[in-house]
């Protein structure tokens, strides 16, 4: 995900589209809205990752607020902004390949309703700037496909998921030819129609539905055949412009690279990638970690990691040991399992002494849990070597600086940067750590960006400040020298200086 926006959700009546960087850090006052943005992201990712199809009906799609354990929303009424005039919530998100807007309606007076009816979804295929506007309201249900004649402002070539140089070249040629031939926007209206759906995530299903409509329509036009009894063929009602467009673009719409490449990476990208929420959690100095305590995030992380059975000399193992040394936790580790029902974690210190993880400080325990969770995600993504960017994962971390010495807080920035640059994982961080923020400034300065444009396109970090008092959030905006163009609100960076001034 590289963009999120919403209306009438939780704290915000309107939250304008926010562009996310590979590592986006939310800072600011308490109750300023950081958690609302995180809940919005989690809610959207959960919806996009849900499998539909089979017996499901496109016209009956619903958005559930009680499926994600992490969002803690539960009902539509709790999700809806208190000042909303109508029971309508809208989310907008993008991942560089697709942009999706989801509108839902619910009963604002119903305290028990756990879902809302999807009233409209606008899915944009960004490389070709095609809007698929699915209107689901009863009596108004239809698909309006708009083929734009100019590229989308939201699409950047550098953000597209190319697997090979050849694929990139084919994709580029197809786009150039497509827009060169387009002289004006073309709108094609089609009935949605009930019926069986392909199995998959929502974006996959909508794309399959769209392509099947286009294929049937183009073939019917080509054969000059109209099947009035089919709920797929939609020749009647087409404008002359739409007919001419579909006829002239037959080769492109039905053959490679449009269909195959536009659908390429759908399996990985349709849900906007995998995600993990590492929320602020307690740690305990317990020697044995029982799998029966699986509802405890701390214990579940150890249990999940143990089940990965990470072997020595693998990239994941090297990652853990490398960062254990950087964080001064130890120089090696061992996880022992008892019938898969309980685990013990041992740490090897720099003096070769073996101790239980429970005998380390709370900060070291906290960091090992973070490393184990990141390592599990690396293993799930099939990471086998540095530079193998299997990303498409968004990791949301809440207050990772808990229990950490300031020096170690700053090193978290290096950890997140390595996870992105070497392995492709993206992060959204909720933090109050001045030391973490200061370290990102140094890392930006060390990149040596030559211009503001280069900085904007390639800076790995972004810091968003939430000032509270219902004031609008803003981007702190790094400069090429690492300094910020904007100022933090009072009580963040200046609090230590203010207290020192009072002492003197």
Locate the predicted segments by residue:
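Generic alpha-helical secondary structure signal
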Residues: 102, 138, 158-159, 166, ...
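Residue-level signal for secondary-structure boundary sites
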Residues: 97-99, 286, 471
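Switch/communication elements of ASCE P-loop NTPase nucleotide-binding domains
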Residues: 1-81, 86-92, 313-504
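The feature marks a conserved, polyanion-engaging helical scaffold used by nucleic-acid processing enzymes
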Residues: 234-342, 377
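P-loop NTPase switch/coupling surface
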Residues: 1-271, 381, 386-389, 438, ...
